């Protein structure tokens, strides 16, 4: 898909500032992921500076991986500010379905503002739609290909957003059309925070593209980088380092050669 390659070039040209309210576990790796790709990360959580920080940012990433009584109000305020400023927002409902706190927080954030993209695994998005039993901790316990497609479509319509359900095959839907993406590698599941990193990558692409194609661009770019990284390293530690390298090295030519994307009309 030519638009994916073109979007990568646009992203690197402007190096968008991406404001992240993300979790303690992945903060460092997410920042390094964005830097390797060509974006500029900032991780600001204090309520007192959110308005100024979001005003100068190109997109807002909200990740609910480590919630507490301080972070939840910051997330709520950030989503409200970004909505008022018409900044694109991507929400990662980490662990939705595992606890009521996570599920209810994600649903409230979806209700507060105009979330551009909802990105989660099969179990998390299922839980937000009220289908229980598909989340194991923060990981998806059960994956069904056909059901994942339907969940992506249904979540988009339910929450009026682009819904991205990631798994062995990723599905991205705006309620009218769906893209399926087969890029990626199973080694990503052996490194913590790779799903969170993909969310932030989509956030960076939101600076240069509308939500549906930004999501496709982010997932394909990350997936191809993972495939190339595994060709050079078969173990989790060095795979992560190689993943940074390939996010830095990936270019338009490689995307055009290796993108595995199908567009599905609903």
Curated annotation (Swiss-Prot):
Q: Where does ATP bind?
A: 119, 166
Give residues annotated as binding substrate.
43, 193
Q: Which cofactor does it need?
A: Mg(2+)
Is this entry keyworded Metal-binding? yes
The Enzyme Commission number assigned here is 2.7.1.50
Q: In which pathway does it act?
A: Cofactor biosynthesis; thiamine diphosphate biosynthesis; 4-methyl-5-(2-phosphoethyl)-thiazole from 5-(2-hydroxyethyl)-4-methylthiazole: step 1/1
One matching Pfam family is HK
Keyword field: ATP-binding, Kinase, Magnesium, Metal-binding, Nucleotide-binding, Thiamine biosynthesis, Transferase
Statement: the UniProt record of this protein carries the keyword Plastid: no
Q: Which CDD domains match?
A: THZ_kinase
Question: TM segments?
Answer: none
- Reactions that this protein is recorded to catalyse: 5-(2-hydroxyethyl)-4-methylthiazole + ATP = 4-methyl-5-(2-phosphooxyethyl)-thiazole + ADP + H(+)
Per its UniProt entry, which superkingdom is the organism in? Archaea
One biological process term in Gene Ontology:
thiamine diphosphate biosynthetic process
Instruction: Give the matching InterPro entries.
Output: Hyethyz_kinase, Ribokinase-like
A single GO molecular-function term is: hydroxyethylthiazole kinase activity
Its family remark reads: Belongs to the Thz kinase family.
Query: Any idea what job this protein has?
Result: Catalyzes the phosphorylation of the hydroxyl group of 4-methyl-5-beta-hydroxyethylthiazole (THZ).
What protein am I looking at?
A: Hydroxyethylthiazole kinase
Name the source organism.
Methanococcus vannielii (strain ATCC 35089 / DSM 1224 / JCM 13029 / OCM 148 / SB)
